[in-house]
Amino acid sequence: MEQPVGQPAYVLHSRAYKETSALVDFFTPQGRVRAVLRRARGKGGSLVRPFVPLEVELRGRSELKNVGRLDSMGIAAWLHGDALFSGLYLNELLMRLLPAEAPQPELFEHYALTLQALAAGRPLEPLLRSFEWRLLEDLGYAFALDHDVSDEPIEADGLYRLQVDAGLERVYLVQPGLFNGAELLALAQADWDAPGALLAAKRLMRQALAVHLGPKPLVSRELFRKR
């Protein structure tokens, strides 16, 4: 019989389950996995919190696994203030958008590095925008930033709107929600110092993610507004 193998993991979300157990959503290189942690008030339960690098051994073949073993694998990313809200935002995006058990090894690595950067006090906006874009790419929802839907190069003096299911479309009449070409070209190069780049990136990612997130508001976004 094949023995379960430990794998790196982070806790995305947990809640009480039955009398002494917890239902935990983990993010691992193999994707988002839900599992039951029994005796959650013991040693293992103390590790079930966000931003702690873990090694988890999961048992079972159904979609709902059982935690066989749970160990700390390093120092938790100590997030506070806006960095904490940002980390919770990343977790909520992963909970809402990741399909169950779809391997995402590169996204997992990007997530771990983003947590480290947040803990180190790096500027938040570039980190969040980079992670959002990587998430869109890995889920197959990304689009070109240097070419429009007609495969024409983005022009610095052009105006564009996002068609979420297709890409950027050039328009010639001013309307709400447009992006100028110079901003888009800066985003294609991840040039966060370019004038307007960060604000444009935030608007663009919000538009791109909205259709996949649906109408339910993000709790982490509401918490950030009320801080």
From Swiss-Prot:
UniProt entry tagged with the keyword Zinc: no
Superkingdom classification of source: Bacteria
InterPro entries given in the database record: ARFGAP/RecO, DNA_rep/recomb_RecO_N, NA-bd_OB-fold, RecO, RecO_C
Keywords: DNA damage, DNA recombination, DNA repair
Record bears the keyword DNA repair: yes
GO cellular component terms, semicolon-separated: bacterial nucleoid
Biological process terms in GO annotation: DNA recombination; double-strand break repair
Family: Belongs to the RecO family.
Protein name (database record): DNA repair protein RecO
Organism of this sequence: Pseudomonas putida (strain W619)
